[in-house]
UniProtKB/Swiss-Prot annotation:
Its EC number is 1.3.1.98. Residues 33-197 form the FAD-binding PCMH-type domain. This is UDP-N-acetylenolpyruvoylglucosamine reductase. Pathway: Cell wall biogenesis; peptidoglycan biosynthesis. It is an enzyme of class 1 (oxidoreductase).
Length: 306
């Protein structure tokens, strides 16, 4: 199908106001980088997501899912096919000791709702700048907690558009990994089972984690969050720091002087700058310590053609 055929097909199953053509993706990423999407869709209902995925599958159109854009780098060549934004699926509901949240809900907001209902278990997420869908996708975690600890189930859609309800065990949550990644599923919503707590203790823990995050992380610049996974027996930031790479810069992107595990966009940096800096850091750390640094951040899209 050519782009006009795809557009007509999408307009036959979706409201026109949720379809954007040749949409710049830098508007939707924390790094403020990225080329254009052929089609950028922002459905507001689960049924619309299913319809999009089914249409794409039947017509062999690639689909890329995008949440909050906080732990992703999109190359300047953009993304072919469909980019499906889940941010409008942002409902948050509570029932006794459970919270059900849409894929596009900010996990920070869900953590705050848990606190407001005096439920403990999601304090670790109070500073994670991602969506629920992204958090399940990568089993997000911080300061000793992770999604795996409190999720009950996730409602997902497979590549054919079929609806799946996956339990914690079926999600196969591991360190920054899940069956959602492995099988290219899309999360529609997730349910969390929490425990009744004490408001002052919950708030104190969230305040402590927020203070630690603000004191250690370079929140004053655009960034993609933590760049590398934790290698066994090491800390990525410490290895980078001991390699004297803090402040090292390629183009407009540099290794943060505040936290070596972060790379910040200090001067109109590009995805190409980010990728080159990542490869340089990996090379130096490998040479100096014989340790492979694997990326936590996802790098997607086409390389620029010029």
């Amino acid at each position: 199908m050519n782009k006009n055929d795809i557009l007509r097909g999408l307009e036959s199953i979706l409201p026109k106001d949720i379809i954007k053509v040749d949409e710049p993706l830098k508007r939707y990423t924390y790094t403020e980088t990225g080329g254009e999407a052929d089609f950028y869709l922002s459905p507001t209902k689960n049924e619309e997501v299913q319809a999009i995925v089914k249409f794409a599958h039947e017509n062999s159109i690639p689909v890329t899912y995008l949440g909050n854009g906080s732990n992703i780098i999109i190359r300047e060549g953009g993304i072919r096919g469909i980019v499906l934004s889940l941010l409008s699926l942002n409902h948050i509901e509570t029932s006794d000791d459970a919270i059900i949240a849409g894929s596009g809900a900010a996990i920070i907001d869900v953590s705050n709702v848990a606190r407001d209902h005096v439920l403990t278990g999601l304090e670790f997420a109070c500073g994670i700048p991602g969506s629920i869908g992204g958090a399940v996708f990568m089993n997000a975690g911080a300061y000793g907690g992770e999604v795996k600890d409190c999720i009950d189930y996730a409602l997902c859609v497979n590549e054919k558009g079929d609806l799946l309800k996956l339990t914690t065990a079926e999600l196969e949550l591991d360190y920054r990994n899940s069956v959602v990644q492995q099988k290219h599923l899309v999360v529609l919503e997730a349910a969390f089972t929490l425990e009744p707590g004490k408001l002052d203790e919950i708030q104190a823990k969230m305040d402590d984690l927020t203070e630690r995050r603000e004191s250690k992380q370079p929140l004053e610049f655009p960034s993609c969050g933590s760049v590398f996974q934790r290698p066994p027996g090491h800390f990525a930031g410490k290895l980078i720091q001991d390699s004297n790479l803090q402040g090292y810069r390629i183009g407009g992107v540099e290794v943060s002087t505040k936290h070596a595990g972060f790379m910040v966009n200090v001067d109109n940096g590009t995805a190409t700058d980010y990728e080159a800096l990542i490869h340089h850091v990996q090379k130096i750390v490998k040479e100096k310590f014989d340790v492979e640094l694997n990326t936590e951040v996802r790098i997607i899209g086409d390389h620029p053609t010029d």
